[in-house]
């Protein structure tokens, strides 16, 4: 068997060379990290769930006109994606105060924000992904002025769609992190900005609309337990998997309790 060529390996995913020019295979690992990878664990079945959830959301975003790198799911852990040149920025959209926003500004966790906030962080693990401004982005050439405007517009469109999607499933979209890349279609000189990476409970804060229970990676960060179970509950509410947990024997019903 020919060994696939690894293009990039991150904390939660591996990118392999794709079967066709301009494509990659994105593999979702069970590895879970927090606090700049100082906290680590392997959670059985997490990669399967993130693959399915990200596929579901990216497919729906395509249907509402948000261009992204997703092509199709290949199997339980892999999907075929377009190869893009990643812009070295993490884009965070916030609807409710939580995480670093509460810490930095002293805003109580759970307070609704007057409007969605879009923040940018420079992708650099060694520097702990520092927050940057539009001036930094322009000065260091991380994105052009037009790309910056496109990213803001796309991020807010993603937020509008996902807020409604999750609200229909009884979930509040607190905030989320996304990434974008430049896609050179047919070797054209002008690249197109595409949503890339993934959208899953690893990259979103999701709270139960009635109880406020956390259904995302904060369960791992805060040692609450039930991480995979919470991700499975998100998938069930979105209609991705059946109540029985068809994708993995490691997925069981999420009760909201700690373990």
Curated annotation (Swiss-Prot):
Q: Which UniProt keywords apply?
A: ATP-binding, Ligase, Nucleotide-binding, Purine biosynthesis
UniProt xrefs under Gene3D superfamilies = ATP-grasp fold, B domain, Phosphorylase Kinase, domain 1
Q: Which GO terms are recorded in the biological process aspect for this UniProt protein?
A: 'de novo' IMP biosynthetic process; cobalamin biosynthetic process
Pathway the protein contributes to: Purine metabolism; IMP biosynthesis via de novo pathway; 5-amino-1-(5-phospho-D-ribosyl)imidazole-4-carboxamide from 5-amino-1-(5-phospho-D-ribosyl)imidazole-4-carboxylate: step 1/2
Which GO cellular component does the record give, naming just one?
cytosol
Q: Which regions span the lipid bilayer?
A: none
* Pfam name, any one: SAICAR_synt
Show the disulfide pairing.
none
Drop me one GO molecular function for this one.
Answer: phosphoribosylaminoimidazolesuccinocarboxamide synthase activity
Q: Which domain of life is it from?
A: Bacteria
Q: What is its EC number?
A: 6.3.2.6
Coiled-coil segments on the chain, per record: none
What does the record give as the reaction this protein catalyses? 5-amino-1-(5-phospho-D-ribosyl)imidazole-4-carboxylate + L-aspartate + ATP = (2S)-2-[5-amino-1-(5-phospho-beta-D-ribosyl)imidazole-4-carboxamido]succinate + ADP + phosphate + 2 H(+)
Q: What class of enzyme is it?
A: ligase
Q: What is this protein called?
A: Phosphoribosylaminoimidazole-succinocarboxamide synthase
**Organism expressing this protein natively:** Hyphomonas neptunium (strain ATCC 15444)
